[in-house]
């Protein structure tokens, strides 16, 4: 009886020690991986769900996002600029990232900083981290499965809810 208790205790304790809790550093490393993505956007005002899919690639100098459906678009983020290329219309637009003032995009580019003054990082449980700006108007949830980032959820400034499922490439 005592042997079973200690064996169970040791198993539980070793599982607890070997568990790899999610953290800001894990989130940052996962945010710099290449992924295919499937996004669902829910517009409550229009009662419509839109979907898109594509691939995202990170290098030291830039982030490349290739939207493959429903419309083919390419986004190139480098320095303080985002270049948007509509493949179907063969039109390119260049925008300053500062003008966009997009919390999600800022986290994607810069990663998260536990000491940031502009937002807080909350570990909700062993699979979800939330990043909340100080105004509480921007909440981004990052969900993990076996320490792999697999879902990002947020609501944009227009009130559209986004869910982005990620699959590592």
Pin down the residues of each PLM region:
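Boundary at the C-terminal end of the N-terminal hydrophobic targeting segment
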Residues: 17-24
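Short, solvent-exposed coil/turn segments at beta-strand boundaries
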Residues: 31, 57-62, 77-81, 124-126, ...
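An acidic-aromatic
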Residues: 55-103
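Short beta-strand segments that buttress and anchor functional surface loops
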Residues: 37-39, 65-68, 84, 128-134, ...
């Amino acid at each position: 009886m005592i042997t079973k208790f200690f064996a169970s205790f040791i198993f539980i304790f070793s599982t607890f020690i070997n568990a790899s809790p999610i953290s800001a550093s894990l989130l940052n490393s996962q945010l710099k991986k290449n992924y295919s993505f499937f996004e669902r956007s829910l517009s409550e005002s229009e009662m419509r769900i839109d979907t898109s899919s594509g691939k995202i690639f990170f290098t030291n100098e830039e982030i490349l996002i290739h939207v493959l459906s429903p419309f083919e678009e390419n986004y190139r983020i480098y320095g303080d600029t985002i270049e948007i290329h509509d493949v179907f219309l063969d039109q390119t637009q260049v925008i300053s990232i500062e003008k966009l003032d997009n919390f999600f995009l800022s986290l994607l580019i810069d990663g998260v900083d536990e000491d940031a003054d502009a937002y807080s990082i909350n570990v909700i449980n062993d699979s979800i981290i939330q990043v909340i700006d100080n105004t509480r108007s921007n909440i981004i949830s990052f969900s993990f499965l076996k320490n792999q980032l697999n879902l990002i959820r947020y609501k944009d400034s227009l009130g559209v809810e986004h869910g982005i499922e990620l699959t590592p490439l």
